[in-house]
Amino acid sequence: MASGSRWRPTPPPLLLLLLLALAARADGLEFGGGPGQWARYARWAGAASSGELSFSLRTNATRALLLYLDDGGDCDFLELLLVDGRLRLRFTLSCAEPATLQLDTPVADDRWHMVLLTRDARRTALAVDGEARAAEVRSKRREMQVASDLFVGGIPPDVRLSALTLSTVKYEPPFRGLLANLKLGERPPALLGSQGLRGATADPLCAPARNPCANGGLCTVLAPGEVGCDCSHTGFGGKFCSEEEHPMEGPAHLTLNSEVGSLLFSEGGAGRGGAGDVHQPTKGKEEFVATFKGNEFFCYDLSHNPIQSSTDEITLAFRTLQRNGLMLHTGKSADYVNLSLKSGAVWLVINLGSGAFEALVEPVNGKFNDNAWHDVRVTRNLRQHAGIGHAMVNKLHYLVTISVDGILTTTGYTQEDYTMLGSDDFFYIGGSPNTADLPGSPVSNNFMGCLKDVVYKNNDFKLELSRLAKEGDPKMKLQGDLSFRCEDVAALDPVTFESPEAFVALPRWSAKRTGSISLDFRTTEPNGLLLFSQGRRAGGGAGSHSSAQRADYFAMELLDGHLYLLLDMGSGGIKLRASSRKVNDGEWCHVDFQRDGRKGSISVNSRSTPFLATGDSEILDLESELYLGGLPEGGRVDLPLPPEVWTAALRAGYVGCVRDLFIDGRSRDLRGLAEAQGAVGVAPFCSRETLKQCASAPCRNGGVCREGWNRFICDCIGTGFLGRVCEREATVLSYDGSMYMKIMLPNAMHTEAEDVSLRFMSQRAYGLMMATTSRESADTLRLELDGGQMKLTVNLDCLRVGCAPSKGPETLFAGHKLNDNEWHTVRVVRRGKSLQLSVDNVTVEGQMAGAHMRLEFHNIETGIMTERRFISVVPSNFIGHLSGLVFNGQPYMDQCKDGDITYCELNARFGLRAIVADPVTFKSRSSYLALATLQAYASMHLFFQFKTTAPDGLLLFNSGNGNDFIVIELVKGYIHYVFDLGNGPSLMKGNSDKPVNDNQWHNVVVSRDPGNVHTLKIDSRTVTQHSNGARNLDLKGELYIGGLSKNMFSNLPKLVASRDGFQGCLASVDLNGRLPDLIADALHRIGQVERGCDGPSTTCTEESCANQGVCLQQWDGFTCDCTMTSYGGPVCNDPGTTYIFGKGGALITYTWPPNDRPSTRMDRLAVGFSTHQRSAVLVRVDSASGLGDYLQLHIDQGTVGVIFNVGTDDITIDEPNAIVSDGKYHVVRFTRSGGNATLQVDSWPVNERYPAGNFDNERLAIARQRIPYRLGRVVDEWLLDKGRQLTIFNSQAAIKIGGRDQGRPFQGQVSGLYYNGLKVLALAAESDPNVRTEGHLRLVGEGPSVLLSAETTATTLLADMATTIMETTTTMATTTTRRGRSPTLRDSTTQNTDDLLVASAECPSDDEDLEECEPSTGGELILPIITEDSLDPPPVATRSPFVPPPPTFYPFLTGVGATQDTLPPPAARRPPSGGPCQAERDDSDCEEPIEASGFASGEVFDSSLPPTDDEDFYTTFPLVTDRTTLLSPRKPAPRPNLRTDGATGAPGVLFAPSAPAPNLPAGKMNHRDPLQPLLENPPLGPGAPTSFEPRRPPPLRPGVTSAPGFPHLPTANPTGPGERGPPGAVEVIRESSSTTGMVVGIVAAAALCILILLYAMYKYRNRDEGSYQVDQSRNYISNSAQSNGAVVKEKAPAAPKTPSKAKKNKDKEYYV
């Protein structure tokens, strides 16, 4: 329909008068644009060869049909449309390609426009106002064949689609507006008929042939299809001027009639204008009209005056747009008369006890439901019939005649045996309480339209039923809101269900004992749920099979093009195919369902099929709404759907058109219901597009397009994509044999039909891909790899439900050699007993035995089958990749990833990841394992991965009976496979393109099929060999992995070259589908065989750390800083702790303890996520109540942005170029330093934000003018610190993840969140008491530990919190500690040695007008004394993690300084397993961490730079790695599969506290024993050190740092796992009310420093230049030629012992 309201012209008054006069003079018509509107003019003969058509129009419609003509459905047509407010002409001749003309002049502007259409043979021209264009058709014929009338503004509904050349024209929106001066050449055409128009000639009802006005009344059109008569000058009254001014009283309703039989009724019936013509009433006659809208009817009670007649007449007139409806019925049982409208034709059914007589009357063109008046007359007379044959001669029969409009006549004869029509029931007019139950009724719904002058006469009396109803006769009962005038009754508009998700909910259907439903539908799609309703279960659990717990249900569904009826009244269901042929042919199909108790019938296109429900129940108890077209998405899981309704389980909603829905004879306005419910995907019209939807190739990425109903359907199976057009990449999950995904459904599911599809890629020949499992039965549908084939197992636990026994699980096999590490597609289709298994479009079919078809399941599992209670053989775990799992329309993998469902559990990894499962290291050639005998008698499938630098070595050996054996070995860098099946040894060599001892992982597949074909595959290179003779490999003894004992090598067969074992790593070992744990399952383990695999590389390279992790070079290895990557693990390749935020939102809140809230000048935030949302809040950090500081990371319009406020205005930074709402994984990195900020998304360039101006200097300059001189310095310092608060994030109170509290909840994955040393997601996974979770959350797998690794503590935790401020206020003898600020690196760089005033961060006001701010613990100013650190560089300049220089200055610094308070809190501590530090804190082996201060830089600091202000320094250097922590050495507890390559080296000045660290005064120098370098490798946690990402365009490479080789210098050793403090380092300033002791201490410390420096200089100048002390225990490096992938040295040197407490004062060393 064209948009807009009803057309209302609004021209100026004078112009309006002129135009109205013009329109009246030119017979102008007003088109209302309503449904069913049309105008029909005489044929335009000039269109054949040459002619003109012109008219004027005025409209505001943008799309509508103006003109149409054609040749009657063959080839030629001409169509003039309004499209986008402009005229478009299409025409063709002789089936040529249609020509199209589109004019540019807009005409939908409420102005008058002149249109001229000119035909000239093959050429047609169109002109509007001053614009004209022409087009020509390239056809064989010159003339256009014109057979139709000229249609204007719409197509009459009686014109069939088959009679239209261009069928789509019937569904174009009708024209809305004014049309005048229509001429064909110079003459106006004759208007043959119209509907829905206003104007002088809008309706032929006023034409002389049909003028209803009598006695000279003036006919006028009052409304579409309704006329009125002006009787003012006729002397008559009434609606049609047929009544005298003083009419006589009407006769009694029951009058005797002396006229009988043949005197009253002629054989042919009265024609138009005869006695029966209601449109030509006699003088004094009044018409009686009533309007019926589907729920109204009236009935006359005949119980007191029963009918016994032999001659009858029924007359009435009707007007309707409806195709079906009951007009009149009387009688019951064997005597009845029924007159109905069915499919637009008049049906008559008469039964006098001797069998029904049926008559059908149809018009030649169109239908009777054309909203025009039609007269019906039915007569029954006694006649003598001279029939053919002896039995019919001279017999009396009753002649039945039915005529419509006096022209169309049908006759027939009834038998003479029953001559009387007897009825003592009711005369129903317009409907009945239950039309479907009336005997002989061909329809089940009531009439909708107008009925006029319904009269019944027989030889005894006359019943004027319409008059009696209007006058309210006591024997006449009225039902519904009857209106006794003819009103327009809109046709029941059809609706179109445009997608399978669309549906309309109808009120609950109360049809306990009887009920009827009729409707029309049309579609081209083979499957879909038409109707569904069900009751509640009779008790018991959802998982029970007991028939006592069945729920009643009623459904109609399309399956494979056939219509099925499904009905269950609680005692057994029936499933009946109601159509003998397919009904998805695109034509209208009429369905009529009627039920009475257990009996009933369903009729499809007048072909009826009876049914009888099983069981004894006759009550259909439905509780739910009656759903039309489909089911609501939200209720599909929670609603226990009956398994017999296959389309419900398959989520196959109906797509197509539905019209004329009647329930129990009452109409349902589908369009109104859809609009009231806001039904998505339900359109208020029905049209069938002729263009092929797939012609434009809409499916992307290789999707297969299929035609649907006015839509295309993209089959994305096998493409790796999902979505309507296969536009969205499907989620990939990686499995390593210990990983799974499990969908735990809220309720037990019972299905009889399943559609399953997925893609897989694996190198193993065995492994479970998908299985449905039940907690209560052995039911399963399982897909697994079995010997390189796809195996489908379907087991329906028939014994449990007591059904007829079956032969057990059904199995199907398809495909071969599917373990080729390529993507394959598998699909399973089950429909009851029928099975189909397809692999890469190759289909295998099977048929299940037994009558039981119901599959029960609670879970859908992938990777590992965890529900094992009812299976005897557990399938092997899967190693490989799965993608695109769709089970009955649900893409569970993607729903799980996106958080659309909350009932999934998984630890498999998202993304296509390299898989190395359960690696072990053979550290020497003499190491090996022995397992149980390899079972490889008839066939064999072996798979493993290896990595080594050794060119030779025995990988696998198993001997056997006789000469049988198998060997896999590495010879000169190539794999050899040697075997003997009894025919002598054979050798197969791998054909890899280069030696495989390159320290990279390689895949090896060795297989032998039952046909004795041997296959050796190295990575992607395959060698095959067929051996004749013996086919069985009879092995015995132990299977040796990695080597043999020395004395066995000499006894190996001659083709075996190995004389030594394998040195390197093995992983993912698969022995014929069995995944052994090489260490746990070993019968013997000889030598050094350990879990995990560490490569020989000990130096940083660009590939050392993945995902932009930063490589940190250590003394004997390297570590990776993963904090800003969202990943973890030794090389930043393991996913961080991941939570899935589901629908409805969720929230994770970390709350700092009130006394432990940090205030920061710098913040660092990194997080990974994936989502499809375009607006959400990811992370928000808030300050304490009243302060108003915050930081928020959010998604807006699909892009990432950050907004923060640290005391001034809101500051924003975003990345508008990176769209993150695409469902892919993205990593966001944000840093803040004061008001400066950087933001980076993935590998996009870093966005930087620097605020303009320096507010501090301007404020100080203004303030000094009003401050007394004597207070100037103190207030200057106070103001400076006050201004500094505008760059400090004060008193951080909580971190909130998920945005639920902000009203913008996030849905999707969040992974590896890192903020200022905190890993909140990991804390949440460990149930930290400071973390609270709420909403729909699910943890993916097992989250890594929140405790940072040893290396991380040294450089990450303290570096991130270097600017954390602790505010301390001291008054007299009382000390109160609050979150405040301490001197930092910047303080030590200023040249001002005056006392520093520390202002409270808790003061909520950043007042710039010098208002007094009173801290909570007092208002006095505390002036601490701070000792300055020297700016001179240390003697040894070490390299720190790369920090990008700021734009202005090239040199940069790395500040080093920390205290013990920077460590995580004791609540977060995790005791080390077997660690040495379990004793008391004063134990000599459990040293406290030592603070290290100073500068370390990769560049020499230029001391000539001008001194910088405190604020200016941080503005210039926004990214600074501030400090590191030195700890006492300790032996770590071993952890498998973790890199243990050493510790961070960071030499610097050492300060040893003489008291516990919390009491260490700022600047005080203490002494401690120097730390020895660690010889043992410290344990690594899941985290890694932090480093800021360098600012450079993508792609970003990991930063590489290195450490100088000074083994004798003290090394910064990482924190052990047992030593943890609060998350975030804190500097503590101790202040005193008296400064005397501080001054004395400073002087003494300075003197001591000078003495030490002089002594060191003296020793330096007098040292022996040719002698160096070197710690040989640390001075070694691996020789790659002598090492392999696992071993650096055969034996590590012993660690030097830590100096004992007795030697501390003796062996002290000091470094400055």
Swiss-Prot record:
Signal peptide: 1-28
Binding residues annotated for Ca(2+) 3, in chain numbering: D1189, V1206, I1288, N1290
Glycosylation site list: N60, N338, N841, N1236, S1400
GO MF annotation, one: calcium channel regulator activity
Tissues showing expression: Predominantly expressed in brain.
CC terms in the record's Gene Ontology section: cell projection; glutamatergic synapse; plasma membrane; presynaptic membrane; protein-containing complex
Residue ranges, Cytoplasmic side: 1658-1712
PTM per Swiss-Prot/TrEMBL: O-glycosylated; contains heparan sulfate. Heparan sulfate attachment is required for synapse development by mediating interactions with neuroligins.
Highest taxon of the lineage: Eukaryota
All residue ranges annotated as the EGF-like domain in the record: 202-242, 690-727, 1096-1133
Record-annotated membrane-spanning stretches: 1637-1657
Subcellular location: Presynaptic cell membrane
UniProt region (Disordered), positions on chain: 1373-1392, 1458-1489, 1525-1626, 1679-1712
Segments in the Extracellular topological domain: 29-1636
Domain Laminin G-like: 29-206, 289-486, 493-686, 732-904, 918-1093, 1137-1345
CDD domains: EGF_CA, LamG
GO annotation, biological process: adult behavior; chemical synaptic transmission; gephyrin clustering involved in postsynaptic density assembly; neuroligin clustering involved in postsynaptic membrane assembly; neuron cell-cell adhesion; neurotransmitter secretion; postsynaptic density protein 95 clustering; postsynaptic membrane assembly
A Pfam family annotated for this UniProt entry: Laminin_G_2
Positions of Ca(2+) 1 binding: D335, L352, M420
Subunit note: The laminin G-like domain 1 binds to NXPH1. Interacts with PATJ. Interacts with CBLN1, CBLN2 and, less avidly, with CBLN4. Specific isoforms bind neuroligins NLGN1, NLGN2 and NLGN3. Specific isoforms bind to alpha-dystroglycan. Interacts (via Laminin G-like 1 domain) with IGSF21 (Ig-like 1 domain) in a trans-interaction manner. Interacts with CLSTN3.
Known function: Neuronal cell surface protein that may be involved in cell recognition and cell adhesion. May mediate intracellular signaling.
Protein name: Neurexin-2
Organism annotation: Homo sapiens (Human)
